[in-house]
Amino acid sequence: MMAHNKNDLTNINTKTTAPTTTTTEQQPEQQQQQPEQQQQEKQNNNNNNNNNNNNNNNINNNENNENNNNDIINNKINLLDELVAAAELKGRYTQIQLEELKSKLDRTSSALNVDQDTIKLAWCLLENMQLVSVDTSEQFQKQIVACSLFICGNKKFSSLLYNLNQPSSSSFQPDNNSKIKGRKIRKTNNSKNKNNDSNEEEEETTTDTEEEEEEDTLLNENNNSINKNSSNNNELLVSIRSCINESGGDSQFLQNSVFLSQLLKHFEGEIKLSQFFDTLRSFISNLRLGNAFEEQGRQLEQSFNTLNNLYRKYEQIFFTLFHPTENYILKTTQQHNYNNNSNNNNNNNNNNNNNNNNNRTNEDYLLSIGWLIFLFCKNKLFTKDSPDFVQSLHLLLCIINFIYVNTSISELKKIPQGVQIIDTATGDILLYLAKSIPCNLDDLSNVNQNIFSTYSNLLINNSILKLFDNNNNNNNNNNNNNNNSDGIKSIFNNSSIIKDNYNSLNKSYELYYYANGDIDERLFYSFDHDIYVLNNNNNNQNNNNNNNNHNNNYYNNNNNNNNNNNNNNHLNYQYSSLLPPSTPTTPSRYGSSSSSGGGGGGNLRKNIYGTPSKSLSAGNLGSVIPQTPISLTLTLESWLKVEIQNYRDPNPSLNLINILKSADQPQQTSEVDKMIERVSSLTNNTDSLFSIGGIDDHQQQQQQQQEVKQRRKNMAIQLYYCLLEKLIKFEQNTSSNINVLLNHEDFHKSLLSNSFEIIAYVYKMEGLYFPHFINVFKLHPFSYLRLIDLVLKVDADLPKLLAQHFSQIEEKILEKYVWSNNSTVFSTIKSHDFQNIFNSNGVGAAITTHLRPTQVFSTPTKNQNNNPFRNQQLINTNIPNTPTKKNPFIQNFIKKVSTLIIAKCRKLIHAMGLSSDYVVQIYQVMIKILIDETLLFKNREIDVLLICSIYAICKVNSKNITFKAIIDKSCISAKVYKEVYIGNDENNNNNNNNNNNNNNNNNNNNNNINNNNNNNENNNNNNNPVKGDIILFYNKIFLTKMDPYIHEVFSKYQQQQQHQYQQPLQNLPPPLLNQNSPKKWNPLFHTPTKNQNNNPYNSNNNTPNKFSSSIPLSPQKGVNYNSSFSVNSMVTISPMKQHTPISSSYTYIVAKSPSKELFQINQCLNKKKNDEMVPPPPTTPSSINNNNNNNNNNNNNNNNNNNNNSNDNNNNNNNNNNNNNNNNSNNNSNNNNNTEKKMVGKRLLFDYEESPSTPSSSSSPTILNNNKKNNNNNKSENVDDPGNNSPSSSPLSSSSSSSSSSSSGGRKRLKS
């Protein structure tokens, strides 16, 4: 088998290969040099054999269906040549040699004293991984070695690896329903004598018949990469189980053997945290170990980001109360010049500043003590998830208050000018801290009294914090909350006690770190350049890391003395995570200055982030411009408390109760009671949603934490009642019946999920983001999608950050979640008519944002839209006429999906540098899938179908492109295109069988009999979905369904393009004369200005043509308008001049005329004053007779050419048209000799030197000028014979010419 076949995923992934593969790489080159004719003959023979088998073996129906599928794919490959998903390479990838990785792994493991079991497990991951990047540099190899060691040596990750060893593990489920894949995996496993349960299931799906072993070779090659991936996954699982069993069980996975900070220090600044997190994310994704590993990596990175923001705020506030130190000034002003070549060979995990303890000041020790106290409280309080952002900030403020009040060394403190820091009533500075952030003083005081005091007592009782010197044995530790106590104040009364407390807290943290830690969180105040700051002097930095500059800049600790600059330095990364990208689905109401409807409405003055400031009158909260993640979070919390301030208890307000009573029906339960009972039953299982851990041995701490969880739950319920009241008021403005909403169960579940989602977002609990709450309330995303628009419309005071968060959720639902297996969207789309959604260009209409709640949560209603253009469609969707009901929400849903598709398509086409012409074709294919082939979306994402559509359209347009190029520009995760659902559902299988029946007419009955058997197999496949990569999906499913329509779209688009550029001659006006325009024949872009009844070129004079819809935007001057003319008045921008009526007029379009003629116009205008030519004298009778003879000879040609021009739209008639036009003008001059002689005046000289390809220049009409004075002076002038029609008089050979009556040959220069 070829190592690099056309559809091998090595074109997408760089695979780690052993050194022995270098000798076998020459084999693919030799095989690729075979003539294409031999391959085509081989494929044609296979097709003929398969057709014979279909005709002869009518009994084996399942086998015939499989052969038919192979025939279709093979025929498409032969006919289209490149319509298979071949990710072709123009060169061979540079592959990473395993020997290099092995040597780096051994060196790193020996330096860190890693045990052999961890090394074996890490090598197992490196052997079986697949890389997305093609980077093979030393830097990248060190990064993946570090990732493998950390995953296998960290307790949290290694415990997940141990769970893979359990028999119930479902992280690797082999594809049981693909026969080809089953045979491939069985061969691999049999060669290794691995008899697992999954292998037995695969053997059951295969048979030993020779016909199955001799299936089509090309299809096997297309599936070869998928088989290798599946085999590699099973080999990885077997290798992991083998390593774990040899290590002696799970005892090896209950302790940390590799520490992240220690690991990164080993590489001496070559790997920073920013680079490590990016590589770790990609490493886990490509190993395909499961969502648990991805979630663990996400929590690790999120924890670091949260601590980074908190430390920056802590350091900023601390040095407003204490004098800045030299180390702080050095860190903020000279960090870019820091020497990274310091001795880092010490493998201990102590911070770098321990080597310089003699240079540390008391302020430095106090700064470190405060951060270590916070780490102690944080590790005790948040044991499960990442730190709670708001709770952590309150703890930091309490610690600053604790240090400032209990520091008796007055020289260390810095009192801000004109500010009263210490509150005389309480003796603390909490009021000052609450105003400086700002935050809620009540919440801050509550945390200080109930939470921080408990942990400060624990520190003192365990002798971690010492009250005074060791020589003093006074044991006064009981009343530590009394700030006036001498014992408390003696904690930081001299330098020796400060150093002892620092050492004690440092040792306490080290014990925790070696037992549970992931990142050494002391690096923030130690400012370890080997880990925390990007090394600018590293010459081995690979260009691939430049893509993560925004992350690297964020991890740089660029602090400034100026607080505003300090806040703005670290916004690049974290602020982008707080502000999700705008979605093209739901229109944003923040773009307008007014808001209509209920829920507040009116004009709202918003700041630059869209947070309303009108309703936040208490303290003018909305006027605070958020600049940092902390200030953004506090602003959201303030908005939330103002929003629910009327709901003191988790019960409906009086206003809501009165509204619900009005909806009560006789002899039924009160709506208020039903509401309270429903909320209570749905939220019973939400007590643990805000779990923040705690100390098991202290009942007081558990009670305090339970209060925090209950308080946040109550806030979510209060917000639910607040949003419900707004929605009901909004509905009452348009309809008096609100029972539809009150009795809809999904409506209440969606509203509760929305309320809990807001609470989780306000407090930055990312582990509880969507789709956590819809799973808790057992709600489908399609139902939850209905409420997002209503909340964004009704709640006018919703901050922009929350609106963007819900827009991002909406986009996720439209991309992935709405197309799940149990979604009702497929049957809903099938039962609705969408003919009037798309306009004549196939583009979706504007998204409707005026849907009422009852329209969203209701049954479909009859369509009241009488659109006269309903039946005019560009896209042939073949929608049946049976549906008679429509739901406005479903129509709006289709518009949103189409808008998302066109936005993604345009972005991707632009990134690939392709023409915008591809967008129309790709969009039509996607709309066809959305309306008629909706089942292709099932269990798949929009990105998968969009990539396949782009690839297919590029191929039919003869554009060489690869899947790898499209995937690289789409920036999707590896999981999206590696784990695509391959199984055919019921309808797809029926359609495939019908296609096979059309191709094999002799076996129609036999194939139809087996449809039921195939449907039963598909129902079994839904339980264990078959997954493969995007190339297998493209060849096996996408092409079989969409191939005919792709060619139809391409052919229609080509016809439209040809029709657009080949304008019919009957729509063009005749050559007309105008006194105010330069002479020109047959303009390229013409706006009809003449009644077609008088058009001699129009064969049908009885029915005048309508005006063209594409009116040029350029001005048109001097158009002659008679009573028979009709033109859009907006086109003309200058008044019409009076002139002698003639039989025709002419329009000259300036903006759309050739630039050469515009240059000639300018030349003539410049010569008009100084270069005036004398008009010719009256023509002699001989010349008149001469002209008459010429005209009589060409009369027949005139009639014939006129007919030709009216019937044929051909460019070859241009010369005939010129002759006709010239002869017509000659006829006019000969028939009206006396009149023409008086009208002939001065002529403008035009220098026509156009190419022979533009015949219009050879016979352009002259411009008449009614000047009587000049006419009288022209009688005495002579002119050469104007009737000379010799070729020598052609304008191509003369620089300038003019004549009163010239023939088609040209004109001569006038003489005085």
Swiss-Prot record:
Induction conditions: In the growth phase, expression is correlated with several factors that lead to preference for the spore pathway. During multicellular development, expression increases 200-fold in differentiating spores.
Coiled-coil regions listed: 36-117, 195-230
Biased composition (Basic residues): 180-189
Localization annotation: Nucleus
Region entry Disordered, spans: 1-67, 168-231, 336-359, 536-611, 987-1023, 1168-1236, 1249-1312
Gene3D superfamilies: 1.10.472.140, Cyclin-like
Role according to the record: Key regulator of entry into cell division. Directly involved in heterochromatin formation by maintaining overall chromatin structure and, in particular, that of constitutive heterochromatin by stabilizing histone methylation. Controls histone H4 'Lys-20' trimethylation. Probably acts as a transcription repressor by recruiting chromatin-modifying enzymes to promoters. Plays a dual role, regulating cell-cycle progression and transcriptional events leading to terminal differentiation. In the absence of a G1 phase, functions in late G2 controlling the expression of both S-phase and mitotic genes.
Identification of the protein by name: Retinoblastoma-like protein A
Chain's gene name: rblA
